[in-house]
Amino acid sequence: RVLFRSVIGAGPSGLTVAGDLAKLGYKVTVYEALHVAGGVLMYGIPEFRLPKDIVQHEVEGLKELGVDIECNMVIGKVLTVDELMNDYGFEAIYIASGAGLPRFMGIPGESLKGVYSANEYLTRVNLMKAYQPGSRTPIMKSRAVAVVGGGNVAMDAARCAKRLGAEQVYIVYRRGMAELPARKEEVEHAEEEGIIFKTLTNPVEVLGDENGCVKGMTCVEMELGEPDA
C-alpha cells in the first residue's frame, strides 16, 4: 500500500522532510505558496551568497526521487488542511510554513514610503527582481540607505542596497561591534564593500518629507549594558 504524505511549504525544512520521506518510500506532495520552491533560499539569501542554480539543482533532485511540488498553492485559501486529509487522501501533513512575518520597532514614521522590512526588501530584490525597468513592484532606489539590525539578514540587505547603487549604506545597531549577531565573515564582507557601521546607535523616529517619503532618521546614542533578550 502506498502511503501518502503532504508537506506544506517548500523551504529548507519542508524540502528536507520531503526528501527524507521519499527515501523511506512515501509518496510526497509539497505545496508551496510562492511561484518557486526553495523558500528563504530563493527569496531571502542573495545570489552573491547562494547562487539560485544550486537551489534549483537540489529541487530537481527531489523531483527525481518522486516528490511532487505544487507552487502557487496557499493552504488555507486554495485548499484547507481538512480537504488534504479527507479529500486528497493524505494520512499525515508536515507544516513547514516558515516564520516570514516581520517585526518592526514600533517607532514613529515606520509607515513612510521607503521603509521596508528585511523580508520584503530581500524578496523584492532576490525573487521579484524589482530593480529591473518595468517592474510591477518597483523598489525605491536611494543614495543613502540605513539598515537597522546587526544579524546576517541585515548584512544581506545592506550589501544588496550597495549593489543597487546606494552611495552610502549604514548598519545601525544598538550594541557594539563585538556584539553583532552576524557571522564574523559576513561582517568582514560588508566592511570590505564599504558598508558603514553605526554601533551603539538606536533609532527613535523615521523622518519624512511632505510627500510621505523617508528623508532621515533620528537616533540616540547607547551605552553597552548587560545582554538582554
Task: Specify the residue positions occupied by each region the protein language model found.
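N-terminal Rossmann-fold NAD(P) dinucleotide-binding loop
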Residues: 14-15, 154
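Gly/Ala-rich phosphate-binding loop of Rossmann-like dinucleotide-binding domains
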Residues: 18, 22-23, 42, 158, ...
